[in-house]
């Protein structure tokens, strides 16, 4: 009898099979591989359930360009927390060349600046998504929703400010152009994905423990509707104050949230791997 692979090797093989041919059936010898993105993904598994012993697993997933979109979540011009504003500025500068290259390669770009979408009502990119026929989303999957590994109950600001609505638009460094669309409504975005045959979302922006997880267009709800999400983990940040549990640095708090997402919601990837995978 042939030996079966065990443990993590079996898990990796299973993950590769799941992600093989995302978005469309694969016809061997007939697919145009130049229009696939082969991305290095990271997830976390608990081989012995209930043990609390989580293992990092790295694997590759293949994403057809025409069934993949980037969602830019809440990358505003200003945040009520000055520390968050400063970190978002750094993220925006990193995002811009990647977004521009992805757009040029045929990846759909979705701008999702919550609370300020009305500013863009006359933009063709906003009008485009408003013209999409409504597609009813399926019943949401009943998935576990464990608590976060950090305490963000005070808003998570590490520079002392109190909440006010500071944002007025998406960060101006990020271009809105071409075939992009603008929406911060999960049902609008789901209808757009359904019409375009998009099954995979690469999600970047802020904040990992709040909007990235909880917006109607973001990881939790899209996953519950059967959309395959991937967090771009080096293009996100958290709202976490090191004065709160578990009393680690801000960056360590962000990493804990990323690991939580990998454990319970979706894989993550690096922006550098996406840049490398994009057709040149």
What residue ranges belong to the model's regions?
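N-terminal secretory signal peptides that target proteins for export/translocation
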Residues: 1-6
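Bacterial N-terminal signal peptides
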Residues: 9-21
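Boundary at the C-terminal end of the N-terminal hydrophobic targeting segment
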Residues: 23, 29-30
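Active-site-adjacent betaalpha module
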Residues: 30-69, 86-88, 97, 104-106, ...
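Acidic/histidine-rich, surface-exposed loop or edge segments in extracytoplasmic proteins
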Residues: 68-83
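A cross-domain feature marking catalytic cores of carbohydrate-active enzymes
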Residues: 75, 111-114, 233
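Short catalytic helix/loop segments, enriched in acidic residues and glycine
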Residues: 94
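Carbohydrate-interacting regions of secretory-pathway proteins
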Residues: 121
């Amino acid at each position: 009898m042939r030996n079966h692979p065990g443990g993590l090797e079996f898990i990796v093989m299973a993950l590769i099979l799941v992600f093989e041919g995302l978005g469309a059936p694969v016809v061997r010898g007939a697919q145009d591989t130049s229009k696939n993105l082969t991305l290095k993904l990271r997830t976390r598994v608990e081989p012995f359930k209930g043990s609390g012993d989580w293992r990092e697993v790295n694997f590759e997933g293949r994403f057809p360009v025409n069934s993949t979109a980037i969602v830019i979540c809440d990358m505003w011009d200003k945040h009520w927390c000055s520390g968050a504003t400063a970190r978002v500025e750094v993220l925006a500068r990193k995002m811009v060349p990647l977004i521009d290259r992805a757009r040029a390669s045929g990846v759909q770009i979705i701008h999702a600046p919550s609370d300020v979408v009305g500013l863009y009502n006359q933009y063709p990119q906003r009008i485009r998504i408003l013209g999409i026929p409504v597609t009813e989303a399926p019943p949401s999957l009943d998935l576990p929703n464990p608590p976060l590994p950090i305490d963000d109950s005070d808003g998570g600001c590490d520079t002392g400010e109190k909440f006010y609505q500071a944002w007025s638009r998406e960060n101006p460094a990020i271009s809105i152009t071409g075939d992009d669309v603008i929406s911060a409504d999960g049902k609008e975005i789901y209808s757009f994905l359904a019409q375009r045959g998009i099954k995979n979302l690469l999600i970047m922006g802020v904040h990992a423990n709040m909007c990235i997880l909880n917006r109607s267009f973001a990881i939790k709800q899209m996953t519950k509707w059967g959309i395959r999400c991937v967090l771009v983990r080096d293009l996100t940040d958290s709202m976490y104050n090191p004065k709160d549990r578990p009393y680690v640095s801000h960056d360590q708090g962000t990493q804990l949230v990323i690991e939580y997402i990998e454990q319970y919601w979706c894989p993550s990837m690096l922006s550098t791997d996406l840049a490398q995978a994009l057709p040149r």
